[in-house]
Amino acid sequence: MSKRSATVERNTLETQIQATINLDGTGQCTLDTGLPFLEHMLDQVARHGLVDLDIKAKGDLHIDAHHTVEDIGITLGQAFAKAVGDKKGVRRYGHAYVPLDEALSRVVLDLSGRPGLEMFVEFTRGSIGGFDVDLFYEFFQGFVNHAMITLHIDNLRGKNAHHQAETVFKAFGRALRMAVEPDPRMDGITPSTKGTLSESGDSQ
């Protein structure tokens, strides 16, 4: 299997983002976004997904973090789509349950070529380390729309909002790792009865 890494840049009047992902990495992470708690969460994705991430972002944080968080999700999703390529020989589906003390989250995903997000997390407070918890949805929506995956996120229980968020991102990393893992039994075959996992919206 060829090298599965990609770099994407996104420049708008609101943000300037550069994201690099290596799907066959070792969990290395270099982040410079101006958003410490989001960086803490992305570090969990890298370490638990065994992907290397290098993300640099400048945005209109003097307004709020919405544009920057959403655009990081978009740019990382685009890089992921480029890195994973035609998806031949991968497992396609990934899932993970991750606990952290009282919190438990489940993430299930499909490299379907059809973007879809179902996220059910009732955070116990509105801000974690100064980060608006509503923006987690914006990050994942941006990622899903451009990675072209179906993603289900459920926080099954939790009292501490930090623990809720951390279990979600750890489970996301582990589910990604499972989905993109090469399956030796597939031997370069696309894991779909249609023979393609394209962006046409009808892959099964």
UniProtKB/Swiss-Prot annotation:
UniProt pathway: Amino-acid biosynthesis; L-histidine biosynthesis; L-histidine from 5-phospho-alpha-D-ribose 1-diphosphate: step 6/9
One Pfam family matching this protein: IGPD
Major localization class: cytoplasm
Keyword Membrane appears in the UniProt entry: no
Catalysis: reaction(s): D-erythro-1-(imidazol-4-yl)glycerol 3-phosphate = 3-(imidazol-4-yl)-2-oxopropyl phosphate + H2O
Ranges of biased composition (kind: Polar residues): 190-204
GO terms assigned for molecular function: imidazoleglycerol-phosphate dehydratase activity
Family recorded in the similarity comment: Belongs to the imidazoleglycerol-phosphate dehydratase family.
Name of the protein: Imidazoleglycerol-phosphate dehydratase
Annotated organism of origin: Alcanivorax borkumensis (strain ATCC 700651 / DSM 11573 / NCIMB 13689 / SK2)
